[in-house]
Amino acid sequence: MRQTVYGILIPFLGTSLGAACVLFMRRQLSDTVQRALTGFAAGVMVAASVWSLLIPAMEQAAWMGKLAFLPAFAGFWVGILFLLALDHLIPHLHARSNQTEGPKSRLQRTTMMVLAVTLHNIPEGMAVGVVYAGLLSGTAQITAAGALALSLGIAIQNFPEGAIISMPLRAEGESKGRAFLNGVLSGIVEPIGAVLTILGTRLIVPALPYLLSFAAGAMLYVVVEELIPEMSQGKHSNLGALAFAVGFSIMMALDVALG
């Protein structure tokens, strides 16, 4: 149980440490740095979706033979559509954009920026929760080391995300303390989502392949809809692509080495 608690809190710690950058850094992150950090986060999320979620989902459905892809296929698409729905139902504003997404709202600009990151963090919390639920259920395809690898990978990419949200909030006029707090709060949905998922472990076990791929679909939606456009903004540069490759490689190595 202790390793499960640690696994849930590690990604949240990554967000909190990243948000703490606003307490020590005087200047806003440059576009170049933000592009690199966003590309890195995207790479980690894609690798985690493949090695930690989609592959285990298909392995657990191996008894279906040539149709083992069906649970992963179905869960993946439900995850995509779920995030698409949230994207249209929740008013939010990405840090490097002036165009509000979702329904019209009178919410403050800073509030909608926090909502954008919170929306992004929902699938990550679900991914951690589903993996640890599978571990607690004794599923052979999910090991403690593999679950830890996912938690560490998400924590690594949460660090730059924490900075990317807290620094713009500071630039919008919030105090350092408030910008830090909002950065931390944007990541609170991760442990909450993970705990809620684990609490339903008994109901989840039969549907684990679907839920693993659901989390993967939700994460990849965020990557394609949000992160890839953000890392490609401004003057053309290969920096975002290279940072993506670094993040992908690190997460792949973590999962294979620890899994």
Q: Where is each model-derived feature located?
A:
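Intrinsically disordered, metal-sensing/regulatory segments
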Residues: 1-259
